[in-house]
Amino acid sequence: MRIASAAVAGLLAALIALPAVAQPGKSETGKDIVFNRTKGNCLACHGFPTLPDAEQTGNSGPPMIAMQARFPDKTVLRAKIWDATVSNPKTFMPPFGKHQALSEEEIDKVVDFIHSL
């Protein structure tokens, strides 16, 4: 009986210690959105040279490196993601916010993630 109780206690402890990715209902992270080929799809145009798990990246957009140096003010980066046509009418980058391809919350998550690169 003690062995069974110890086994159950061990299983419960293991379940509680599982990382958030294994938990149902977990909200998407900025990286999830960036890597999502049907949502953000940032990988289609941008390279992510510091992320080994970023496979099959594009090269038509600037690489996502040194983002804090390039965008010291995160609001400028957010504005670019929301609608890059404001600063460059001929850009190929989709206006993710203007066209509601991403929600405000999703854009904030993407900005936080990309700014950390």
Language-model segments: residues:
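Short pre-active-site segment immediately N-terminal to redox-active cysteine/selenocysteine motifs
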Residues: 37-41, 49, 106
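Bacterial N-terminal signal peptides
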Residues: 7-17
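Electrostatic cytochrome c docking/interface patches
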Residues: 18-37
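Gly/Gly-Pro-rich "capping" loops immediately C-terminal to redox-active cysteine motifs
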Residues: 35, 47-82, 98
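C-terminal capping alpha-helices of c-type cytochrome domains
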Residues: 80, 86, 98-117
